[in-house]
């Protein structure tokens, strides 16, 4: 999925599927973002693929909610894919995502997220749990040298 803030597209977020499908400038921008995201996700050229799916998000009308417009990928879904709702809800409980930035700060423990779509609402329970953290430190070079390996190693 490629989450995009409605405001970054000059949208309110509550546009109807018909309004979005008629907005060729927004559709072209979403497609450009989708193609770039496909490359950055390691999916290669996604021109002829349905993945990744673009999703427009904006603040919900109540606490713990997010407004979502899900694309398949070149037209707005009339309601919302369930798998897409799970992705939007997951993004809204993870720190630092576009959905979180829309005012849905992550909370400890299980949290219900209401994904508001053109045909209604989907309630998804989500929880952020850090399973692992890793890093590679590249601050400075600590070794440079040459290793000489004998042509034949002694038998043991």
Language-model-derived ranges and their functions:
Residues 1-156:
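Active-site proximal loop and beta-alpha junction motif in alpha/beta enzyme cores
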């Amino acid at each position: 999925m490629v989450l995009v803030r409605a405001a970054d597209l000059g949208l309110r977020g509550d546009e109807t599927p018909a309004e979005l499908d008629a907005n060729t400038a927004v559709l072209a921008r979403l497609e450009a973002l989708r193609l770039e995201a496909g490359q950055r996700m390691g999916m290669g050229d996604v021109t002829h693929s349905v993945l990744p799916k673009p999703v427009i998000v904006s603040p919900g009308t109540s606490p713990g909610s997010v407004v979502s417009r899900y694309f398949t990928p070149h037209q707005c879904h009339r309601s919302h894919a369930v798998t897409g709702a799970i992705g939007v809800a997951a993004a809204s409980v993870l720190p630092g995502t576009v959905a979180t930035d829309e005012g849905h700060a992550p909370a400890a423990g299980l949290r219900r997220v209401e994904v508001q779509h053109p045909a209604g609402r989907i309630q998804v329970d989500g929880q952020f749990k850090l399973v692992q953290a890793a890093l590679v430190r590249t601050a400075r070079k600590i070794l440079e040298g040459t290793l000489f390996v004998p042509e034949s190693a002694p038998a043991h």
